[in-house]
Amino acid sequence: GYVVSQGVQLSPVRPKLDGATLLVSEARARIVRSAQLPRTPAGVELAVQCKPRLVEAGKLVSGLKPEGRAARTALCVRDAGRTLDAYLTDPAERGPTLAELGSWLAADGCSDALNLDGGPSTAAAYRGEAGVLRIGPGEFLPYSIRFWPR
C-alpha cells in the first residue's frame, strides 16, 4: 500500500486495498479511509496504508474478525491528531483477535486506530539505559516507523 517517509513516496496508493491510511502532515496525525485518498495526496510527511481499521470516531469498527489470535501492531490517534501512539502486543503470547484489539483501543481512548500487521512481523526496539531493547522477531519487515519525542 501507500507509504510516504519524510515527504518522499516509497509506494503508491493502492485504491483497491481496503482499510485505511495513516497520514501525518503539519504535526497532526489522522486516519482516513483508503478509498477517500487522492492518487497523490499533497503535503504528507508520513503515510502508511494498511488494514483493517480498528477504531473510527472513537467507536469499534464493525465487522472485525472475532477469531484468529496473533501478535499485533497498531497505531492510535488521540487529542485531535496531536498524539500518535504505537501499540504492540507481546509477540511471545497468542495475542488478541482484531475485534478484541479494536475494543481495547476504543476503551483506551483512541479516536481512530489502524492495525499495521501481526504475527512474526510484530516487533519494536527502543534505546534504554542498558542499550537497545528489542521485542519480537521482526521478520519480513519492508518498512519500519521511527518515533522521536517532541
Predicted regions and their residues:
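Gly/Ser/Thr/Pro-rich low-complexity, intrinsically disordered segments
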Residues: 1-150
